[in-house]
């Protein structure tokens, strides 16, 4: 009878957004326990070997990590299967590169290059605000952080801006109608838009109606929405496409236009 955690993960059972080859082997890296869920993270080995192409093999990845070249959220990480997740900042000082893990409009993780100034902070969604022993207030974030004595105005589902050097809250964004959000779950993962309406349903999920910059409207659950800026200005730079999901016909037209431009050139 099985006891404890499984230490292996079959490749066919790995999340689709890891984009692993079916025929590349029987197994996939099993994410370690950490700040993100195993189905909502990207292990460091896949970032270094499969995405950044700094290593060809498992052993080369271990060699790079053991030389303490890779930082996640400003801390050196040597665990090859450390689970990096949404909004995490991956830094490689040796090459002066910084990346932020974001979603593209197809729900896949995208390593988005950022400047050194942007790598000094991170946005975190507040899961809950509670009171501990002796009435000390504290909040929990989506990535497992616990921060004591937060601003009394910060509530659940708001977003806080954290300085990664001091781990202090620098600023916060209220979860309000009119603010820009990114969807982090469901069929609309990776889409960016402004909150237009909140529908409260007793005993069920709250529904959030979002409109992107092209005027397309869609709805999703409250738990799938992550506020990334005040008004329509995001506090983090966004990947190519700015979180706008095109229809199949619009994508085809865009490809045809690019092919025509290349032919004329």
From Swiss-Prot:
Keywords: Cytoplasm, Ribonucleoprotein, Ribosomal protein, RNA-binding, rRNA-binding. One of its GO terms (cellular component) is cytosolic small ribosomal subunit. The keyword Cytoplasm applies. InterPro entries: KOW, Rib_uL2_dom2, Ribosomal_eS4, Ribosomal_eS4_C, Ribosomal_eS4_central_region, Ribosomal_eS4_central_sf, Ribosomal_eS4_KOW, Ribosomal_eS4_N. Residues 42-104 form the S4 RNA-binding domain. One of its GO terms (biological process) is translation. It is found in: Cytoplasm. One of its GO terms (molecular function) is rRNA binding. Its main location: cytoplasm. The keyword Ribosomal protein applies. It holds the Pfam family 40S_S4_C. Signal peptide: none annotated. CDD domains: KOW_RPS4, S4. Belongs to the eukaryotic ribosomal protein eS4 family. HAMAP family: Ribosomal_eS4. This is Small ribosomal subunit protein eS4. It comes from Zea mays. The gene is RPS4.
